[in-house]
Regions:
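C-terminal substrate-binding/active-site "lid" region of AdoMet-derived donor-dependent transferases
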Residues: 84-85, 132-199
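Residue-level signature of catalytic and energy-coupling elements of molecular machines
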Residues: 36, 55, 119, 195
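N-terminal auxiliary segments of SAM/dcSAM-dependent transferases
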Residues: 1-25
Length: 200
């Protein structure tokens, strides 16, 4: 078994993170796992980081991030009071997860979370880019973001490549784009974007 990034392991084409035991990281469920298997060169999560996770859902990917971070902290934002219940269950066993029942479009409502090392966003809404920009007020200079961009949530009719191109152009106004990965066959019409807050 090879440790391909700190806290991320690969064996026979499968990914794992480690809590007390190795936990399989499914690329068909978790977009960062898909991006890694598609050849992502840089995966900036490190032990001790503070992460703002937008669109935490049931907490599957949050739990893997938790394994990697160790004594770091994840502020896990989820808007649905129904969906967040599973996340709350996971957080009981993982001290570094802080669930926030909030709307990611309004980061001013989170309360004090301080400066963040990395923002991860997986929110299938038309204003995905704007949500990232609004939340970047918490991002440290030279902090990272990872965005799982869902093209059809932005526009269900237009050409996907056109949507990607416009999104990257818009993001480039505020951030340095480091890598882009098309997530097919794991996710249709998704572009995984890694960037850095080096323009502030």
């Amino acid at each position: 078994m090879e440790e391909i990034f700190p806290g991320v392991y690969k064996e026979n084409g499968n990914l794992y993170t480690k809590d007390e035991n190795l936990e399989p990281w499914n690329p068909f469920v978790s977009k960062p796992a898909a991006a890694i298997l598609k050849g992502l060169k840089n995966f900036p999560l490190r032990k001790g980081m503070k992460i703002l996770y937008l669109g935490a859902a049931h907490g599957t990917t949050v739990a893997h991030f938790s394994n990697i971070l160790g004594e770091g902290i994840i502020y896990a934002v989820e808007f649905s009071s129904k969906v967040i219940q599973k996340l709350l269950e996971k957080a009981k066993n993982k001290e570094n997860i802080v669930p926030l029942l909030e709307d990611a479009r309004f980061p001013e409502n989170y309360g004090w979370i301080g400066k963040i090392d990395l923002i991860y966003e997986d929110i299938a809404q038309r204003d995905q880019i704007l949500i990232l920009k609004r939340n970047s007020v918490f991002l440290k200079k030279d902090g990272y973001f990872m965005l799982a961009l869902k093209a059809k949530a932005i526009d269900s009719v237009r050409d996907v490549k056109e949507i990607y191109s416009e999104a990257l152009k818009e993001l480039s106004k505020n951030f340095e784009i480091l890598e882009t990965i098309n997530l097919e066959p794991y996710e249709k019409d998704h572009l995984f974007i890694l960037g850095k807050n080096s323009k502030h």
